[in-house]
Amino acid sequence: MNVISAMMEIAANPQTAEGKPTTPITYDSNCLEEICGSCAMRINGKARMACSSLVDNLEQPIRVEPLSKFPLVRDLQVDRSVLFENLMRVKAWVPVDGTYDLGSGPRVFPQQQEANYPLSNCISCTCCMEVCPQFNEATGFVGAATIAQVKLFNNHPTGKVFAEERLRALSGDGGIQECGFAQNCVEACPKQLPLTEAISDMNRDVIVQKVKDFLRG
């Protein structure tokens, strides 16, 4: 049994420690198979996915807490809107003009597919942001997940149209310069994304972009 299944059973018959009926605990959950990223929480003090955390593999008693870096909604539910705001800030999408037939689109070669696929596995769970010492209100750091998505879309043959804008966004306030390279993110990521590699690559590209902008005047 995983943690989220145990919580669902508790929610079906919620009781206080004294055995009195009470309201069910509030938490986010959807896919139950580590795809949607919604059930991220602190389990025994560690940011992880409740759906892939097995009860038998955890130290007992199990302590569950909400993620601490995000506004608390209620119980274990938090507001992770900041991630999506950051993704909008760096234009983390592929622009598509639907007013005419786009055809089959550009060819993506196997080498590109192999390089990009790991980054496409991000489930927006925000575990990387939770464990990052630089992700806080003071720095406004966009976080590893956002930086990794910049690399993904800048490597996409259609997404490249916004490449310079994305790099400029990463060079601004709360951008890549706030990363202290603690590498907590890559340890916490449930999908084993190459986050530190993405950060290093984007740091290089940001510097190159700043030099280009300087020379252009």
Functional labels for PLM-detected ranges:
Residues 51-53:
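Charged interaction scaffolds used for protein-protein
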Residues 39:
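Conserved phosphate-handling catalytic cores of large alpha/beta enzymes
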Residues 55-57:
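Short, compositionally biased
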Residues 28-33:
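Serine/threonine-rich, repeat-prone extracellular segments and beta-strand-based repeat modules
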Residues 2-23, 64-217:
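Ferredoxin-type iron-sulfur electron-transfer modules in oxidoreductases and energy-metabolism complexes
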Residues 60-62:
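A short, basic-hydrophobic beta/loop patch
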Residues 43-45:
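Short strand-turn-strand beta-turns centered on an Asx-Gly dipeptide
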